[in-house]
From Swiss-Prot:
Family annotation (PROSITE patterns): AA_TRNA_LIGASE_II (PS50862)
InterPro entries tied to this protein: aa-tRNA-synth_II, aa-tRNA-synth_II/BPL/LPL, Anticodon-bd, Anticodon-bd_dom_sf, His-tRNA-ligase, HisRS-like_core, HisRS/HisZ, HisRS_anticodon
Keyword flag Magnesium: no
Reactions accelerated catalytically: tRNA(His) + L-histidine + ATP = L-histidyl-tRNA(His) + AMP + diphosphate + H(+)
Phylogenetic placement of the source organism: Bacteria, Bacillati, Bacillota, Bacilli, Lactobacillales
Record bears the keyword Methyltransferase: no
Official protein name in the record: Histidine--tRNA ligase
EC nos: 6.1.1.21
Description of how the protein assembles with itself and partners: Homodimer.
Organism per entry: Streptococcus equi subsp. zooepidemicus (strain MGCS10565)
Length: 426
């Protein structure tokens, strides 16, 4: 049997990983500017943490979760999304306590798991960057969080991203709209897909989220949820829109957008771009004012989003964005003969301790092969170290582009390599 990675997973090799690290680094820097701190939650949770919060009737719970019973007969699931685990942690660790400053702003970066048909930008193990903000019902929080995602895309150089916006209103507004959907869709029940016939009974808003052709036809002219917002919900949505306009962030209203999770209320949004003539959602989120209370905490407003790293990197690649990923070595040490092995080891460590990236030959190859490795590694400087250099206590440094050489003592290299390096590469 040939052992291979499971279907829907990937190995992220070092060249690609450098791009991942760059994107993650830009995200961390951006979130820090907005006063977000990192949180790390377990990769697996009790099944109920996800099923009850995400929604028992959602596709995530009914079709896509990796769940199992452990040896203690506990029902466990690999996390399919990031918000529910963070809310669980917020409540469990009593971050709602009065001594904790509000709002509490958290971000996470990590693996999520869903049993889906693998395709470009969508894997069974995928990586998500997400943020959650607890304790503010101010519409400015909605807008600031959306603006933070918009800011991140700008910093990464992504173009052609469109903000899709909608409001699900409060509980009363949703209840009124739920009944309106039932009244509208019930006469055409038989034309809906089997899944949407079930959704019509359990959670009619899920029908709007269907990707099936027959369902899209059925909901093409459904009533708009915006017509069912009460005064409070309308005021919140109006404030969000006016603040987005004040920040010059363009948006389109998408009244059929409901998001795939049941915990949302009021503002929901998606950032969508076009890839290979198909629309692709790269970031989505919204407000979830009842979720903390649902987990046993006090009534606490919340707002957040998640974005897929694989999709983000796919879009960067499709748009031809060159990420400023650092490549190459500062120094490559060519080692001539076994007698130079110990000296090369000491010199390599001394240069590394001064903050430089260094590699050396370990294979006892001929000098020509070592110089070829230095070129492959894009080394800026090559140090040649052999028996004669060791006897003299000096090494020859060569600029790997201009081929200019200089000779310096081992003591100088070990104590002030920064000055030597700067002189060599100037």
């Amino acid at each position: 049997m040939k052992l291979q990675k499971p279907k829907g997973t990937q190995d992220i090799l070092s060249v690609a990983a450098a791009k991942w690290q760059y994107v993650e680094g830009v995200a961390r820097e951006t979130f820090k500017q907005y006063h977000y701190g990192e949180i790390r939650t377990p990769m697996f949770e009790h099944y109920e943490v996800i099923s009850r919060s995400v929604g028992d009737t959602t596709d995530i719970v009914t079709k896509e979760m990796y769940d199992f019973y452990d040896k203690g007969d506990r029902h466990i699931t690999l996390r399919p999304e990031g918000t529910a685990p963070v809310v669980r942690s917020y409540v469990e660790n009593k971050l709602f306590a009065p001594e904790v400053q509000k709002p509490v702003k958290l971000y996470y970066i990590g693996s999520m798991f869903r049993y889906e048909r693998p395709q470009a930008g969508r894997l069974r193990e995928f990586h998500q960057i997400g943020v959650e903000c607890f304790g503010s019902a101010n519409p400015a929080t909605d807008v600031e969080t959306i603006a933070m995602a918009y800011h991140l895309f700008e910093r990464l150089g992504i173009k052609g991203v469109t903000l899709h916006l909608n409001s699900l209103g409060n509980a009363a507004s949703r209840a009124a709209y739920r009944q309106a959907l039932i009244d509208y869709l019930s006469p055409m029940r038989e034309t809906l897909s089997k899944d949407s016939q079930r959704r019509l009974d359990e959670n009619p808003l899920r029908v709007l989220d269907s990707k099936e052709k027959e369902d899209k036809i059925a909901v093409a002219n459904v009533p708009s949820i915006l017509d069912y917002l009460d005064e409070e919900s309308q005021a919140h949505f109006d404030a969000v829109r006016s603040m987005l306009e004040a920040l010059a962030i363009p948006y389109v209203i998408d009244t059929n957008m409901v998001r795939g999770l049941d915990y949302y209320n009021h503002t929901i949004f998606e950032f969508i771009t076009e890839v290979d003539q198909s629309e692709l959602t790269i970031c989505a989120g919204g407000r979830y004012d009842g979720l903390v209370e649902y987990f046993g905490g006090p009534a606490t407003p919340g707002f957040g989003f998640g974005l897929g790293l694989e999709r983000l990197l796919l879009i960067l690649d499709k748009q031809g964005v060159e990420l400023p990923v650092e490549e190459g070595l500062d120094v490559y040490i060519a080692v001539l003969g076994a007698d130079a092995n110990v000296a090369a080891l000491a010199l390599t460590q001394a240069i590394r301790r001064q903050g430089f990236t260094v590699e050396r030959d370990y294979l006892g190859r001929k000098i020509k092969a070592q110089f070829k490795s230095a070129d492959t590694f894009k080394a800026k400087v090559v140090i040649t170290l052999g028996e004669s250099e060791i006897k003299a206590g000096q090494a020859v440094l060569k600029h790997n582009q201009t081929r200019q050489e200089m000779t310096v003592s081992f003591d100088q290299i070990q104590t002030d390599f920064a000055s030597i390096f700067a002189e060599c590469v100037q």
